Amino acid sequence: MQKNKTAYFITGTDTDVGKTYIASALIKYLCEQGLQAVGMKPVAAGAELVSGRLLNSDVIELIKAGNVDADLALINPYVFAPAIAPHIAAEKVGVTVSLDNIQQAFDVLQAKADVVVVEGAGGFRVPINHEQTMADLVVKLTLPVILVVGVRLGCINHALMTAGSIRAAGLNLVGWVANRIDPNMPAIEENIATLKAMLKAPCIADVAWGEEPQFIDF
């Protein structure tokens, strides 16, 4: 784990593979190392109106995990009520997600914190507007990537395709997390062993169902 000012992008092999759980745990781990750490979710789809503001549950978890005081608008520049693809949710309310606006918010957070942990929405290539995907945002911010693999049937293919996409974009896959979201998966150890052999990046945590991640340095 780098101890200087830096940032990481958390992506996943699919939606609902535990990105927020892992991102929040990583933020807590960084705080325990004596660092100022803050989470960011640039685009969130799926929120409830609370005291006149749309709040996304993932964003709330990221805020709770960190130790940096920052405005909600910086941590979550774009939030939409329906839990649908971000670019569709944005279109329904006449909004176009701007990478420049996200960059500005990120820069402010990076000035405040030692580490910014940026969590994506959905998978690596999820569209955020009609021309750009989450991958374009990561390229713009030049962030090293941590891949959360939801360990279930089909995860090897999903993980290898996502890792290939990350590297094809010229980005650095600095590590991956085996998140055992299906504890009853047949041949689970063999699947994880295959991932360790083929992903060509360190497994920074192997998370059993219902347990807290134990990160290794990376």
Please provide the spans of the model-predicted regions.
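Extreme N-terminal starter segment of soluble prokaryotic enzymes
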Residues: 2-9
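Short, high-confidence coil segments that cap the C-terminus of an alpha-helix
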Residues: 5, 35-36, 112-114
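Glycine-rich phosphate-binding P-loop
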Residues: 10-23
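N-terminal phosphate/diphosphate-binding loop that engages ATP/GTP or pyrophosphate donors
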Residues: 21-96, 100, 105-108
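Conserved catalytic-core segment of NTP-binding enzymes
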Residues: 32, 108, 115, 120-200, ...
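Short, well-ordered secondary-structure micro-motifs
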Residues: 50-51, 86-90, 127-129, 158, ...
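Beta-strand-loop-alpha "switch" segments that mediate conformational coupling across diverse proteins
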Residues: 84, 196-215
